[in-house]
């Protein structure tokens, strides 16, 4: 896989760095039976109020139904294509199983068309793209698409280039210790499933959109500085010219302390599952 640096033909292209999709993807047409309509919300809730800032516009998309559960056990599937998915940073692969069923999965790094994958329990080989419970995966193995609770479907380590490392059982033998990308060490139920390998498109982090219009195509609206707003819109707003914050610490748009303040609630039930906080 490679990235392309666009030549300086115009100011919109001057800083652009993009992933060379043509060298990776095998088709531009998705599987129609696995597509559903994706209505645009523009960051609004059912009352029309903004609940997520900087969302809106963007190119029309359809959602690809992804198999995060990987619960089709002991039936081999063949990788038929590696495709672009506008709804995530990683690539996706179309899998056709021996019984004819088709499913999309998150494409692991290094997977190729024609490769065989399988899901199951202790009898499954530790090979790229295979999915099995954490208790049967050897220490040191890199995995992705990890379940937070059994049969819930993968929720952790799904973005481009992400992976987590198996560290082994804890002292109770009921949980598996896993080191996440952030450096956090966390306990997972040993029955939770994970997929072998690293998520594809690891060079996504090197991309540079180059111009504001590219962000608008992705549905990302501008982020305005608080100091450029009016005082009724932001705690940093108002004043004559470029005024300082005027407080002992920066604030969020809702008046809470910002930068360097821990916001995690220690009373969350999942706190007991965190062995070491992220760096």
UniProtKB/Swiss-Prot annotation:
Pfam families xrefs: Ribosomal_L2 (PF00181), Ribosomal_L2_C (PF03947)
The entry's keywords: Ribonucleoprotein, Ribosomal protein, RNA-binding, rRNA-binding
Region listing for Disordered, in residue ranges: 223-279
InterPro entries assigned to the protein according to its UniProt record, in alphabetical order: NA-bd_OB-fold (IPR012340), Rib_uL2_dom2 (IPR014722), Ribosomal_uL2 (IPR002171), Ribosomal_uL2_bac/org-type (IPR005880), Ribosomal_uL2_C (IPR022669), Ribosomal_uL2_CS (IPR022671), Ribosomal_uL2_dom3 (IPR014726), Ribosomal_uL2_RNA-bd_dom (IPR022666)
Any GO molecular function: rRNA binding
GO biological process: cytoplasmic translation
Signal peptide: none
Biased composition (Basic residues): 254-267
Source organism superkingdom: Bacteria
UniProt xrefs under HAMAP family: Ribosomal_uL2_B
Family indicated by similarity: Belongs to the universal ribosomal protein uL2 family.
PANTHER family from the UniProt entry: LARGE RIBOSOMAL SUBUNIT PROTEIN UL2M, RIBOSOMAL PROTEIN L2
Main function: One of the primary rRNA binding proteins. Required for association of the 30S and 50S subunits to form the 70S ribosome, for tRNA binding and peptide bond formation. It has been suggested to have peptidyltransferase activity; this is somewhat controversial. Makes several contacts with the 16S rRNA in the 70S ribosome.
Description of how the protein assembles with itself and partners: Part of the 50S ribosomal subunit. Forms a bridge to the 30S subunit in the 70S ribosome.
Protein name, entry field: Large ribosomal subunit protein uL2
